[in-house]
């Protein structure tokens, strides 16, 4: 893969050609000291971008479905009705699925794929009586942040409606929800991830009747990306006589 990206870069430089894409952004990037990113760093960043959302998106898509199916109630029925309002699945219709969007957000709140986020202290700070010295690392827990009772009502319960108006509990204070991190290093693939996961579940809901066998599986905290224990996930499916 390094060779593929390196080859594309070399052709662009040889032909003095520019493109409107993320590779060009990295090729043009400059450090504070004025130096450009060396080719091996550009190819490394491209490979990271390619794989960064692979496991997190698939795991979040899985949790989204598992919570929907174990709920067996109002949410799933309303999601089916939401799909019926759209003649087809395309970019515009995917953007107009607020309940499905909220269902993905709720799955991320309850089961974020990353155990922690890490930041470096850039200057000495005092916080609630503690001294945070420059150079120290701070670890943030999206799981704990998503289950704070002062932010989310009944935080251990599955309730996608908390993300919809008028409640919008995630807006109670800045960074009240860390599904995609925050600050200048917030996940740049957030919009794509939502589009991807919502597309998957739009097609599944429109074409299949789904039912979970057994209860909600336990998260596997031994994995780099926290997904459900795969041997506990059983779902029955039946193709609809006619798609929604």
Question: Predicted regions: what is each one?
Answer:
Residues 84-86, 185-186, 190-244:
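Cytochrome P450 proximal C-terminal region
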Residues 56-80, 190-206:
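Cytochrome P450 catalytic-core helices
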Residues 140-168:
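Conserved cytochrome P450 K-helix/beta-meander segment immediately N-terminal to the heme-binding cysteine loop
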Residues 3, 7, 89-128, 149:
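Conserved cytochrome P450 K-helix E-x-x-R motif and the immediately C-terminal K′/meander segment
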Residues 1-30, 72-82, 99, 103, ...:
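Cytochrome P450 heme-thiolate monooxygenase catalytic domain
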Residues 1-61, 97, 163:
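Conserved cytochrome P450 catalytic core segment spanning the I/J/K helices
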Residues 13-17, 91-98, 185-189, 225-226:
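Conserved, non-catalytic sequence blocks in retroelement Pol enzymes and Pol-derived host proteins
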